[in-house]
Amino acid sequence: MATIPVNPKPFLNNLTGKTVIVKLKWGMEYKGFLASVDSYMNLQLGNTEEYIDGQLTGNLGEILIRCNNVLYVRGVPEDEELEDADQD
């Protein structure tokens, strides 16, 4: 699957209020509700789970991720969110 370049500010604004996965340069992933994005593209996530090497390591609640640590951000499809809710 090919990736298409997207302007980051509208992309992040469209993801605000939805569940996202943020991967850091260091390999950790955070899955949570994107509460807000500032002008520097720092990310505030709520109800956040931390994953290291694909394994859930803990629930962190509300976190702030500084922009320069982010490798990528992706939205979580709604059907994937529903599957996760069913597992709980």
UniProtKB/Swiss-Prot annotation:
Function text: Probable common Sm protein, is found in U1 and U2 snRNPs and may be part of the spliceosome.
Keyword RNA-binding: yes
Example of a GO cellular component annotation carried by this entry: spliceosomal complex
InterPro entries for this protein: Lsm6/sSmF, LSM_dom_sf, Sm, Sm_dom_euk/arc, Sm_F
Superkingdom of the source species: Eukaryota
Protein name as catalogued: Probable small nuclear ribonucleoprotein F
PROSITE patterns referenced in this protein's UniProt entry, alphabetically: SM
Native species: Arabidopsis thaliana (Mouse-ear cress)
Gene Ontology biological-process entries: mRNA splicing, via spliceosome
UniProtKB keywords: mRNA processing, mRNA splicing, Nucleus, Ribonucleoprotein, RNA-binding, Spliceosome
Similarity field: Belongs to the snRNP Sm proteins family. SmF/LSm6 subfamily.
Record domain Sm: where: 7-79
GO molecular function: RNA binding
